[in-house]
C-alpha cells in the first residue's frame, strides 16, 4: 500500500469513498457527515492546503484522510475530561475507507503513516473527534492507543467524543 498526498485527479475517488461513509452513517443512524460536509469543495481545499492524503492499493485509492497542524479553536474547551497534553498537536480529520476494504486494517495503516508525518514535523500529540454512535471509529482509535479524553462541541453545536494519542 502507498500513502501519499491527495491530487486533483483523486477527487472523484475520494468523493466516492466519502459518499460511501455518508451512506453508512445514514443507514446506522449516525448524525455525522449528513449535512453536505465533507464535499468536493472540502477535498479541493485539503489538496490546495497540502493536508489531504490517500492510501492506494495497486494504484487504486482505498482510503482518505486529512491532517492539520496548528491546533483548532474548537478543541480549546473540552468537557467531562481533559486533554492528555497542552503541547502543540495535529488533528486527524475526515477518515474514510472504501467499503470493500473496511475491517482489513486500512485505518490502522492510515494512522501509522500519519504518526510518521507528525514525527517528521516534531509533533508528538494527535487529536481526533468522532460521533458517539460511530463505534467502528472508536474501536479503531482504541486499537491504535488513542485515549478517550472527553467531549467537545463543534461550531454547529454537535457533540463529539474527543481522543488523543501521544506518540
Protein language model regions, located:
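Conserved acyl-donor/pantetheine-binding loop and adjacent beta-alpha core of acyl/acetyltransferases
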Residues: 66-94, 102
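C-terminal "cap" of GNAT-fold acetyltransferases
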Residues: 85, 143-144, 151-167
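Conserved GNAT-fold acetyl-CoA-binding loop/helix
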Residues: 22-42
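Conserved active-site alpha-helix within GNAT-family acetyltransferase domains
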Residues: 108, 120, 132-150
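Conserved acetyl-CoA-binding loop-helix of GNAT-fold acetyltransferases
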Residues: 94-97, 103-116, 139-143
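Conserved GNAT acetyl-CoA-binding A-motif
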Residues: 111, 118-130
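Conserved beta-hairpin
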Residues: 51-65
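A short beta-loop-alpha structural element at the N-terminal edge
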Residues: 2-16
Amino acid at each position: 500500500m502507498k500513502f501519499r498526498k491527495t491530487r486533483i485527479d483523486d477527487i472523484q475517488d475520494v468523493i466516492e469513498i466519502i459518499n460511501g461513509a455518508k451512506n453508512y452513517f445514514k443507514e446506522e443512524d449516525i448524525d455525522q457527515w449528513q449535512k453536505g460536509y465533507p464535499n468536493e469543495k472540502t477535498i479541493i481545499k485539503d489538496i490546495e492546503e497540502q493536508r489531504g492524503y490517500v492510501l492506494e492499493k495497486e494504484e487504486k485509492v482505498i482510503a482518505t484522510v486529512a491532517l492539520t497542524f496548528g491546533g483548532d479553536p474548537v478543541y480549546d474547551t473540552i468537557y467531562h475530561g481533559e486533554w492528555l497534553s497542552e503541547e502543540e498537536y495535529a488533528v486527524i480529520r475526515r477518515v474514510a475507507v472504501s467499503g470493500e476494504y473496511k475491517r482489513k486494517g486500512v485505518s490502522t495503516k492510515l494512522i501509522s503513516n500519519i504518526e510518521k508525518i507528525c514525527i517528521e514535523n516534531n509533533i508528538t500529540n494527535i487529536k481526533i473527534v468522532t460521533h458517539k454512535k460511530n463505534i467502528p471509529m472508536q474501536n479503531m482509535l482504541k486499537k491504535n492507543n488513542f485515549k478517550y479524553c472527553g467531549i467537545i462541541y463543534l461550531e454547529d453545536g454537535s457533540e463529539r467524543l474527543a481522543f488523543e494519542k501521544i506518540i
